[in-house]
Amino acid sequence: MQIYPLRLLPNKIDFDFMNFKKVSYTFSIILSLISFIWIGMYKFNFGIDFAGGIVIEVRLDQTPDLPKMRQVLGELGIGEVVLQNFGSERDLSIRFGSSSEDNLMKNIELIKSTLQNNFPYNFEYRKVDFVGPQVGRQLIEAGTMAMLFSFAAIMIYIWVRFEWYFGLGILIALVHDVILALGFMSITKLDFNLSTIAAVLTIIGYSVNDSVVIYDRIRENLRKYHKKGITEIINLSINETLSRTILTVVTTLLANLALVLFGGEAIRSFSVLVFFGIIAGTYSSIFISAPILTIFANKKFEK
């Protein structure tokens, strides 16, 4: 029995993507400017990881229902409340922000009374600590360094595997994706925390993977069609990989949609940002990183 590959599109596609490169450049520049302006005006909604807050360590007499506890505490109206296990399954860390010292004790007592009234557990409160913004600044610096190191590692990989102008194309696309992701976070007021740093790194990896698939086909077609110009080869390569690109993005979005809908508040910022980033990364790999090669490679291939 012969097995046929799954295809969402016909074998022969001849859509002129390169005809839209000026439109896509303009569109991306406008979106990037909007992101910069919005971030400058409204900043980010920093979560407890970066803004600081209160940490309560508590031990229970049995394994708690964490999703239910997150839901109940999230409805108190005191901002982000993060519950995590540490040590055993009966040890909990409860973190939340505090807008001022005046409501500090009030919010601590509110959390304690809410837990006591809604759950049939015995709570042993072991420690209450204040985490200052200095820790948040250190985490921001660590997150920034993680992104810079990922950029550097990706550039080294691309320059070793491809030509230098391929690396520039991917670098521009990645900067574009990160700017749009940060702008999206600022506009939607998603919590900026450690999980969103992980989401940005995930977006970077996804975008690079998409671009490398197209770049591989471009390199292959450059060897195969010596008489064709770089613009025609790029357009051909995008069309040849389009079915794979669409299949990948659809399956990835569907998997991530489950996290958005059912993952709960604990990973909401991560899942929503990754969902947006998959769309942005797919767009940039087709309309930014591939077409922009014509700027750097025209002189080499179209003499």
UniProtKB/Swiss-Prot annotation:
The chain crosses the membrane at residues 28-48, 140-160, 164-184, 194-214, 246-266, 272-292. GO terms for biological process: intracellular protein transmembrane transport; protein targeting; protein transport by the Sec complex. It is a multi-pass membrane protein. It is found in: Cell inner membrane. Pfam families: Sec_GG (PF07549), SecD_SecF_C (PF02355). GO terms for cellular component: plasma membrane. Gene3D superfamilies: Multidrug efflux transporter AcrB transmembrane domain. Keywords: Cell inner membrane, Cell membrane, Membrane, Protein transport, Translocation, Transmembrane, Transmembrane helix, Transport. Its main location: membrane. The keyword Transmembrane helix applies. Coiled coil: none annotated. The keyword Cell membrane applies. GO terms for molecular function: protein-transporting ATPase activity. It comes from the Bacteria. Forms a complex with SecD. Part of the essential Sec protein translocation apparatus which comprises SecA, SecYEG and auxiliary proteins SecDF-YajC and YidC. Part of the Sec protein translocase complex. Interacts with the SecYEG preprotein conducting channel. SecDF uses the proton motive force (PMF) to complete protein translocation after the ATP-dependent function of SecA. HAMAP family: SecF_B (MF_01464_B). Belongs to the SecD/SecF family. SecF subfamily. This is Protein translocase subunit SecF. The gene is secF.
